[in-house]
Amino acid sequence: MPRRGAVPKREVLPDPVYQSKVLTKLINQVMLKGKKSLAESIVYGAMDIIKEKTGKNPLEVFETAMKNVMPVLEVKARRVGGANYQVPVEVRHDRRQTLAIRWLTNYARERAGKSMKEKLANEIMDAAAGTGGAVKKKEDTHKMAEANKAFAHYRW
């Protein structure tokens, strides 16, 4: 943590094709070893596949997927009197977005075979339909928060 006050958040520029800041964040998450042009081709390729398969605006499908994956609650470890409690806390909007994008890309990478474009497109379409690994991760996170509701009074 810095001693000289809070570090300002860097503003993300909207992507050149869809003019969406969230899509830029997805591109940055997909990017490995600084290869941004490759990450852009993967994401835009996935968007083309989504448009081809669904016949809908790919940005709307992506936004639906994001809504279905963004968690409302998560658990944080809190140490009280020698015991660690999993305390449920609400998730801020920017963290919701970050977690959703991270889960989408991670579960897309874990999918079997094919190119990353196809895997990402399939994960986004599954998330928009309410299925897929990323949606399951959100549901598991919510179940953990629900199971530990008794420790909610330890919030800070």
Swiss-Prot record:
Keywords, in A-Z order: Ribonucleoprotein, Ribosomal protein, RNA-binding, rRNA-binding, tRNA-binding
InterPro entries on file: Ribosomal_uS7, Ribosomal_uS7_bac/org-type, Ribosomal_uS7_CS, Ribosomal_uS7_dom, Ribosomal_uS7_dom_sf
Gene Ontology molecular function: rRNA binding; structural constituent of ribosome; tRNA binding
A GO cellular-component term linked to this record: small ribosomal subunit
One of the GO BP terms on file: translation
Keyword Nucleotide-binding included in the entry's annotation: no
One Pfam family in the UniProt entry: Ribosomal_S7
Entry keyword annotation includes RNA-binding: yes
Entry similarity comment: Belongs to the universal ribosomal protein uS7 family.
Function: One of the primary rRNA binding proteins, it binds directly to 16S rRNA where it nucleates assembly of the head domain of the 30S subunit. Is located at the subunit interface close to the decoding center, probably blocks exit of the E-site tRNA.
Subunit structure: Part of the 30S ribosomal subunit. Contacts proteins S9 and S11.
The protein, known as: Small ribosomal subunit protein uS7
